[in-house]
Amino acid sequence: MYRRICILVLTLLAAQSVCFARTVNPGMRAPDRVSPGGFSPDSLNTATSERNQRLYDSIQSKTNRRAVPRMLYRMLFVKPVLDTTMNGRVLDESRLLEPYAGKTVGDITIERMMPFDSCGNWFERAGNKTHMLTRERVIRRDLLFKPGDKFDPQLVVRNKQLLRSRPYISDTEVIVVPDSLDSTRVNMVIRARDSWTISIDAGIHGEGRTMVGLSDANIFGTGNTLKIKTNFSRRDFSYGGNIVEYKIPNVLGTFYTADFSAGRDFYNSELNLGLRKEFIRPTDYEIGLTYSDIKSKRYMVDLDTSLLVKVRNLDVWGGKSHYIRSIKSSVFLTGRYSYARFSRRPPVTADYNPALHDHDAMLFGGGLYREKFYTANMVYGFGTREYLATGYKAELVSGYSWGEFNDEMYLGMSYQTGGFRGMGYICLLYTSP
């Protein structure tokens, strides 16, 4: 009995170390990999890799002796299918697609796959049976290209990163097939594997407040997120209210994101509305508007107690970027207006509770940025592809704030860069207010 408990504990601890990673690669062919800057990650430490492999082999051999530990092992562990860290390479997918650059995009076929392997364990097979596949039109509306467009390798890689960023897609593959009848055309196959999107959440807060929540990031296969949180007191199980959240990641194929949340949590309440679009292409625009009406308790240090604060916030912004081919960078300009109005708060003065002052602010920014995505799995290192951005962003920001008691001018600058170096992926950030 003691040995069984030890095996079970070892299994759970090892599973925690891999963060319950469980991703299946959709049968991607392994092309030649390009390593920018000769990057070789720390995972090339052979002794460490062999020691870890011996540990996992030992756990596997011990858990195979009994049915329950064997089921837990198969449920929590998976052998990586695609592991770029083991050979020290990072993949520049855009370079592999260069032979097709400039050709005309022909037919685009969408292939959808279940989140789990059909040959997996009982839990995975049951999950596939209860899962509703993402609708084809949802994936198609997330494409940055259409039939008749010129094939752009960088745009295709950027689109793969966009699809992978969706909570309802675990992995995606783009297969380019030259047209047999027209040498100037290429047909494309988009393979997308769904994610398991149903999750349960819970939280324990002070004063006996407890929250349980249920969410689905792909409700009815639409790609939309629905989350419902119920609050109650764990002291007497009295009802404390519900909070409902809903998010549409791509409204009618416009790449606008809309989100909404409303409800109450005992004495706290919220109403949030948002509609926004971000920079996606090198030449693009962004625009957004958010409004919130929130009542919540805030801790007052000088009073050593929490008091209710009610505030309304409005935030409006927009911007434009343009790609300059000669410097392989985009120049951008942005503007932003925001205000905060407090209808319930503790006493305030010019130097007392400044965070609770009513204020308006107007900011303008401009600068340059360059962005390119490489494919690797060094972040998690368990067979899941990541799209890591390299490049830089330099920005100058200026603006003015009209406060309840005083006005202020703002001037700041920032520079950030990230890329692959000899020791790994390095990211640097500099800001000056």
What is the predicted role of each segment?
Residues Y2, F20-P433:
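Immediate N-terminus of the mature polypeptide
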Residues L8-Q16:
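Bacterial N-terminal signal peptides
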